[in-house]
């Protein structure tokens, strides 16, 4: 029974991540797991390389800004679209299942986030091939907070080298871009 509970808790945490909960507090709210159980599940999933804890490049020790992310795109896709809807699959035409549960946000939310990871990987590979000058030694997200303007947010693809930070604008669209874009 304890092993089944552990599997259920792991699935619940992975489902929370799949539905967009990234911060510890958001995962806790979604899963309603006790803090000790949640911490244990997150550690176990991390040790299995299913998830990792991601910190902003400019705040590597800020636990409040840490986010949990999937390490594998297929696992991410499964828990985002399939896991919570799997009971419907046996009763539906595959195209209708896609239209109802996957299609509505695949191009507008899921793929653009994955594209950011692809861009980070491209930059890392380019850096290793000495195609970026000066070479960077860190890559990640950059968090900002402007209390006077009551504004905060993050940049998704940022590198750091000996001269400072370089910010990259990453957009994924399902349409051709014009030269002005």
Give the ranges of each region predicted by the language model.
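Accessory nucleic acid-recognition modules appended to NTPase machines
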Residues: 1-154
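Residue-identity detector for threonine
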Residues: 29-31, 108, 159, 163-166, ...
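Conserved catalytic cores of phosphodiester-cleaving nucleases, focusing on short active-site segments
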Residues: 123, 155-174
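Short conserved micro-motifs at the rims of enzyme active sites and ligand-binding pockets
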Residues: 80-82, 169, 179
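Mg2+/Mn2+-dependent nuclease catalytic core
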Residues: 173-181
């Amino acid at each position: 029974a304890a092993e089944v509970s552990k599997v259920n808790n792991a699935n619940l945490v992975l489902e929370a991540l799949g539905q967009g909960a990234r911060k510890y507090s958001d995962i806790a709210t979604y899963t309603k797991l006790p803090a000790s159980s949640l911490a244990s599940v997150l550690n176990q999933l991390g040790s299995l390389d299913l998830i990792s804890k991601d910190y902003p490049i400019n705040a590597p020790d800020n636990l409040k800004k840490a986010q949990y992310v999937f390490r594998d795109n297929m696992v991410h896709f499964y828990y985002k679209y399939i896991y919570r809807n799997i009971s419907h699959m046996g009763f539906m035409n595959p195209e209708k299942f896609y239209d109802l549960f996957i299609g509505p946000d695949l191009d507008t939310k899921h793929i653009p986030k994955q594209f950011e990871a692809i861009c980070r990987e491209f930059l890392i590979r380019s850096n290793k091939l000495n195609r970026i000058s000066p070479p960077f030694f860190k890559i990640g997200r950059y968090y900002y907070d402007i209390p006077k303007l009551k504004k905060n947010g993050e940049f998704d693809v940022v590198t750091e080298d000996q001269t400072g930070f370089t910010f990259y604008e990453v957009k994924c669209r399902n349409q051709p871009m014009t030269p002005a874009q």
